């Protein structure tokens, strides 16, 4: 199914913690900042939102805050709702739908190492359980599971509410293959380093980590590309190159949270174990890079 809702600039929003718990006030402020700076879609509780170390109750709280904060605006909510257990993924997807999310992002089932047929059946069950759009999330470097292009195409053609895929494999050829066969599919970049080439090849948008820091830049990058002005889009992409690179000097979301703390966007630098603070050397590199960009704290 072609989607007109989930497109453009999307932020993979972090989950701020304070004294070991979700900083709900800080979370709402971060979302409002994204809205004010032109972001089209908020994506809570994905990889960047540390969904893997949140309880199901915390997961639900993040979705509720995102939906409530976006009410009365044109900004959509694409709620993270994946699991390596199909029944759990269905439960999260239903919760997201029932609480007002516009669509769900469903990560490939990690650790289990299912076959392509298993992936097909997993996503078919999820799609049949809800009416809102479902965006697949392919990130084999983290899940150990690769949703092959043929499987994505099959699901897109057979399931009316599967709209496409967040492609975070880093494989631009994969994205071109998908779009050459299904030009109306929602293929979005899941890696900031390849945002521009995916947009230039017909991608519908980006789910960005960098947008946590510079939402206005990412919004303009997408707006220009979707209007066909690839010269201006590329210029912005090139401006973000150094920042995009440093934000993956360690595993996401370790660098982005450090960068946001340095920029004054979050009050405390807290992670959930086994994630921890970056090395002193990398923290210094992040700090030096952040100083080159004009980022206003909250």
From Swiss-Prot:
Q: What class of enzyme is it?
A: lyase
What are the site positions for Part of a proton relay during catalysis? 47, 111
Question: Where is it located?
Answer: Cytoplasm
From what superkingdom does this record's organism come?
Answer: Bacteria
Enzyme Commission numbers on file? 4.3.3.7
Main localization (coarse): cytoplasm
Reaction(s) catalysed by this chain's protein: L-aspartate 4-semialdehyde + pyruvate = (2S,4S)-4-hydroxy-2,3,4,5-tetrahydrodipicolinate + H2O + H(+)
Provide the binding site for pyruvate: 48, 207
Alphabetized, the UniProt keywords read: Amino-acid biosynthesis, Cytoplasm, Diaminopimelate biosynthesis, Lyase, Lysine biosynthesis, Schiff base
- Note the SS bond partners: none
Task: State the family named in the UniProt similarity comment for this chain.
Answer: Belongs to the DapA family.
Say what the protein does: Catalyzes the condensation of (S)-aspartate-beta-semialdehyde [(S)-ASA] and pyruvate to 4-hydroxy-tetrahydrodipicolinate (HTPA).
Give the multimer and partner information. Answer: Homotetramer; dimer of dimers.
For this protein, the record's HAMAP family field holds:
DapA
Name assigned to this protein: 4-hydroxy-tetrahydrodipicolinate synthase
């Amino acid at each position: 199914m072609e989607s007109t809702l989930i497109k453009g600039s999307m932020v993979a929003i972090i989950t701020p913690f304070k004294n070991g718990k979700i900083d709900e006030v800080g979370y709402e402020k971060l979302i409002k900042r994204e809205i004010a700076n032109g972001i089209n879609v908020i994506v809570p509780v994905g990889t960047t939102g540390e969904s893997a170390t949140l309880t199901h109750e915390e997961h639900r709280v993040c979705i509720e805050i995102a939906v409530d904060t976006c009410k009365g605006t044109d900004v959509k909510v694409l709620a993270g709702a994946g699991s390596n257990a199909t029944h759990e993924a269905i439960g999260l997807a239903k919760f997201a739908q029932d609480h007002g999310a516009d669509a769900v992002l469903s990560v490939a089932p990690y650790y289990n190492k299912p076959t392509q047929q298993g992936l097909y059946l997993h996503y078919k069950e999820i799609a049949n359980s809800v009416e809102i759009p479902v965006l697949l999330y392919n990130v084999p470097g983290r899940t150990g599971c690769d949703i092959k292009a043929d499987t994505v195409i099959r699901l897109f053609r057979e399931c009316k509410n599967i709209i496409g895929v967040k492609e975070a494999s880093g494989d631009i050829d994969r994205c071109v293959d998908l779009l050459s066969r299904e030009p109306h599919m929602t293929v979005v970049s899941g890696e900031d380093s390849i945002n521009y080439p995916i947009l230039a090849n017909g991608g519908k948008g980006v789910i960005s980590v960098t947008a946590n820091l510079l939402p206005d830049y990412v919004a303009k990058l997408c707006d220009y590309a979707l209007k066909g002005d690839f010269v201006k889009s590329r210029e912005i992409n090139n401006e973000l190159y150094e920042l995009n690179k440093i934000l993956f000097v360690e595993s996401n979301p370790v660098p982005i949270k450090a960068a946001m703390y340095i920029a004054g966007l979050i009050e405390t630098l807290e992670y959930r174990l086994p994630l921890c603070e970056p090395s002193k050397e990398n923290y210094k590199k992040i700090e030096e890079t952040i100083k080159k960009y004009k980022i206003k704290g909250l």
